[in-house]
Amino acid sequence: MKQTKYIFVTGGVLSSLGKGIAAASIATLLKNSGLKASILKADPYINVDPGTMSPFEHGEVFVTDDGAETDLDLGHYERFLDESLSQDNNFTTGRVYQSVIEKERRGEYLGKTIQVIPHIVGEIKDRIKKAGEGKDILIVEIGGTVGDIEGLPFLEAIRALRLEVGKNNAMNIHLTLVPFIKAAGELKTKPTQHSVGELRRIGISPDMIICRSEKALDRDLKDKIAISCGVEKNCVIESVDAASIYQIPLNFLKQDILNPIAEILDLKNLKPNMENWDSLVKRVIAPSNEVKIAFVGKYVDLKESYKSLTEAIIHAGAALDTKVELKWVDSEKLENMESAEVFKDVSGILVAGGFGYRGVEGKIKAIQYARENKIPFLGICLGMQLALVEFARNVLKLKDANSSEFDEKCENPVVYLIDEFMDTNGEKQIRTAKTPLGGTMRLGAYKCDIKEKSLLAKVYNEAKSVKERHRHRYEANPKYRVDFEKHGLIVSGESKGLIEAVELNCHPFFLAVQFHPEFTSRLEHVNPVICGFIKAAINYEDN
């Protein structure tokens, strides 16, 4: 069997430098060179997965087709690679320890003392190898920063794995910060030197340095970094702040990043075809048109909470040659504001998902304003559920209508908790209000059957069904379906009896979906729901 080659990506100095974007950019170039490339994110935190972490703590939880709740970097990987990944492409310290402890309880270690080396490190290596099966090359991003105590087992694993597979089958790329000191008017390399020194103490010598900086590095500075860090001069790559993250692969390509990679890994001459990508990036950076939409959410102070959705909107804008300006609206603050004043200058209203009661009434106000004023509207996940609540209260006149998530004693629960459902593996899952939160939602891709001649059908180019990803615990209550449809709110999408999409039949564009269309949107293949909504907003603006 052909040996998979590995590129290990580590980060130094501080976090949030963009290791995920750098890794995804390199993977994109390799894939477009004809290689079967994939990416793995290894997170050193002890949570089993990010599913129960606060959006303010971790940002978005990205969901894969097979229902894994993963790091938001997996979203970047999918959007850059234009491929669907799985639970094998992300794991945490918590997941590793959970697996090792379960094996110990089953007696698989035959009574041995369980230790970080070899057992924890061995589990990490096994998971890396599994993710690389059937691939020409696997890029492994190690979360956190070199020097973090929780990252040591991961660094030991990649050190050992490189020795195991041989020098032409693995390389290390270290991404570090080269800060610009305004008072001195110069870039400083000392943090990079210290970071590489820390990495070497662990037993890893980088083959390539990627330098994050707000200003370009001149040749002398690159040579200084190469000499002090012990890498070839053509292996110092700059990653300067860009107008769009989708520029990064093109910026890397201009610096011939693939030449040293091909040399180190003994690969054929790599010449990626990036023409279509380049064309789309130009439309992202300098589009011909502009439209403004309101983005109504409860986590608007941390935009990373909606990373896939904001990226999907960028994809739609590129496809339509339009800059989409987002007007961020805090749903909690909206409760005490005048809707007409807030939405007077927008051509569309998007109500995003979320959990918990805070800000719910503000979202309902936004939905009511979009419905009554015939402004293009898209509701996602909780946004669909609240569209049902708003319609029930203001059209069906069920003033106490609510979701049982927010009022368990509600007499008209138009949204409720179902006790049983089939997961993506076809297995029955049972949940109650007291079920543990971790991993108990309806997660992953499910088939949605589409009503003929509906807005949803038009958006999906008359497809009879689609598969989209979910992450929710509560469902639309079918008890109210007849009354909803009698008054014009049509169910246009279903999944084995569960309501997946609703729309208004006397409105230019009023669509609400239970699934998350943003999770399957890519720069080169925008999700039809997002694109349809932005197109409707453009038409509203023009008219």
From Swiss-Prot:
L-glutamine binds at residues 354, 382-385, 405, 473. Mg(2+) binds at residues 73, 141. UTP binds at residues 15, 188-193, 224. CTP binds at residues 15, 148-150, 188-193, 224. One of its GO terms (molecular function) is ATP binding. Pfam families: CTP_synth_N, GATase. PROSITE patterns: GATASE_TYPE_1 (PS51273). It is an enzyme of class 6 (ligase). Keywords: ATP-binding, Glutamine amidotransferase, Ligase, Magnesium, Metal-binding, Nucleotide-binding, Pyrimidine biosynthesis. GO terms for cellular component: cytosol. It comes from the Bacteria. Allosterically activated by GTP, when glutamine is the substrate; GTP has no effect on the reaction when ammonia is the substrate. The allosteric effector GTP functions by stabilizing the protein conformation that binds the tetrahedral intermediate(s) formed during glutamine hydrolysis. Inhibited by the product CTP, via allosteric rather than competitive inhibition. Residues 292-543 form the Glutamine amidotransferase type-1 domain. CTPSs have evolved a hybrid strategy for distinguishing between UTP and CTP. The overlapping regions of the product feedback inhibitory and substrate sites recognize a common feature in both compounds, the triphosphate moiety. To differentiate isosteric substrate and product pyrimidine rings, an additional pocket far from the expected kinase/ligase catalytic site, specifically recognizes the cytosine and ribose portions of the product inhibitor. This is CTP synthase. The lineage of its organism: Bacteria, Pseudomonadati, Campylobacterota, Epsilonproteobacteria, Campylobacterales.
